[in-house]
UniProtKB/Swiss-Prot annotation:
Catalytic reaction(s) noted: prephenate + NAD(+) = 3-(4-hydroxyphenyl)pyruvate + CO2 + NADH
GO biological process: antibiotic biosynthetic process; tyrosine biosynthetic process
Highest rank taxon of the organism: Bacteria
Name of one Pfam family that matches: PDH_N
Annotated NCBIfam families: PRK06545.2-4
Record-annotated Prephenate/arogenate dehydrogenase domain positions: 2-283
Annotated function: Probable prephenate dehydrogenase that produces 4-hydroxyphenylpyruvate (4HPP) in the novobiocin biosynthesis pathway. Novobiocin is an aminocoumarin family antibiotic that targets bacterial DNA gyrases.
Gene of this entry: novF
Entry similarity comment: Belongs to the prephenate/arogenate dehydrogenase family.
Pathway field: Antibiotic biosynthesis; novobiocin biosynthesis
Protein name as it appears in the record: Probable prephenate dehydrogenase NovF
PROSITE patterns: PDH_ADH
Keywords from the UniProt entry: Antibiotic biosynthesis, NAD, Oxidoreductase
Gene Ontology MF term list: NAD+ binding; prephenate dehydrogenase (NAD+) activity; prephenate dehydrogenase (NADP+) activity
Length: 362
């Protein structure tokens, strides 16, 4: 990838521009806000000039409700060969793209998951995506070259690609981000009725709890919530049943004499289930990552779908990638893909890749 257009210069779009510029990609910036556009250009995310020709990739970093119309508009103008969005909802976005007659073969749904609060180009960082998961959601008819280009984008930004279908993505986002945010919002709403003494007591404690969506990003968040309503309802119903069970247990405890005693076994089971669930999430999102990583280098030729095939084989080996880098070999069109894994996984990955006829070395 040599050229890219970033459409939308908020925190995500500007951070992508910064990461691509670091990799030598010529980045062109577009935004309906002249102020945001000037700031993104000033911080070094790219140029606000029009690209002189069709670019390799357009990254659509706009609010969810605008993704489909923006892609449709730029496809009709021939802005880019391929398109990737970064919205947090995929099923409804694909439905809208289809309704607008977009060429879905050139579009890959994308969604980088970053925990940094903030918005706007001044909150951007070139390393924002380092080691973070980045969902890629190709359609059944997505061109292999489009997916390869999207994988290059993710690698250039230092993120870890996770390829899955739209329904699985939306279920995961409902469970892992939207429902927790809803629960936190409901708890925070109770603070409106707390007395001032309680609020002073809770000040430092509350600041350590994961932050609520801010006013500046509330609109985008509610758009994602509304578009993802069906899977969110399903998860909330499960959560409601768990909460009802917990309430029953706690009522039994509350009816006691109030003395300190060994914890109720059902309460311990409740806590343990949460610990077990958290421990299923790899890397920094649950199980601690070992400080030392091992690299496995794989030579990948420039045939369509080779990058996608490699990542499928890595996943098939049961290995979690902790880092990825793609470099062009100076003497050939082939690329070297460096996959960082735990030392424990490196030997297994090397064996599996060689078994699948990949030229791999550690």
């Amino acid at each position: 990838m040599r050229t890219a257009v970033i459409i939308g210069t908020g925190m995500i779009g500007t951070s992508i521009g910064l990461a691509l510029r670091k990799q030598g990609v010529d980045s062109y910036l577009m935004d309906t806000s002249p102020v945001a556009l000037r700031i993104a250009e000033a911080v070094g995310a790219g140029t606000a000039e029009e690209p002189p020709e069709t670019v390799d990739l357009a990254v659509v970093a706009v609010p969810p409700v605008h993704v489909a119309p923006v892609i449709a508009s730029h496809q009709s103008r021939g802005t880019a060969r391929f398109y990737v969005d970064v919205a947090g909802v995929k099923v409804s976005t694909r439905r809208e793209l289809d309704a607008l007659g977009c060429d879905l073969a050139t579009v890959v749904g994308g969604h980088p998951l970053v925990g940094r609060p903030g918005s706007g180009p001044l909150a951007a960082r070139g390393d924002l995506f380092d080691g973070r998961p980045w969902a890629l959601v190709p359609a059944v008819g997505t061109d292999a070259a489009a997916l390869n280009r999207a994988l290059e984008l993710v690698a250039a930004c230092g993120a870890i690609p996770v390829v899955l279908d739209a329904e699985a993505h939306d279920r995961a986002i409902a469970l892992g981000t939207l429902v927790p945010q809803i629960a936190l919002t409901l708890v925070a709403a109770r603070l409106t009725e707390a007395d001032s003494g309680a609020l002073r007591l809770l000040g430092s404690v509350w600041s350590e709890i994961p932050q609520l969506v801010g006013v500046d990003s509330a609109t985008s968040w509610t758009q994602v919530l509304a578009a993802n309503a069906a899977p969110v309802v399903g998860e909330l119903e499960k959560l409601s049943r768990d909460l009802a069970s917990l309430l029953e247990t706690l009522r039994g405890v509350a009816d006691g004499d109030g003395s300190l005693a060994e914890p109720d076994g059902r309460l311990l089971e409740f806590i343990q289930r949460g610990i077990d669930g958290s421990n299923r999430v790899p890397g920094r999102y649950g199980i601690p990552t070992e400080t030392a990583l091992a690299d496995v280098d794989v030579s990948v030729d420039d045939r369509p779908a080779e990058l996608a095939r490699l990542f499928d084989d890595v996943a098939g080996a049961g290995v979690v990638m902790r880092g990825i880098d793609i470099s062009q070999r100076p003497d050939s069109p082939d690329r070297t893909v460096t996959i960082s894994v735990t030392p424990r996984d490196a030997e297994n990955l090397l064996h599996e890749l060689r078994r699948r006829k990949w030229p791999a070395n550690s």
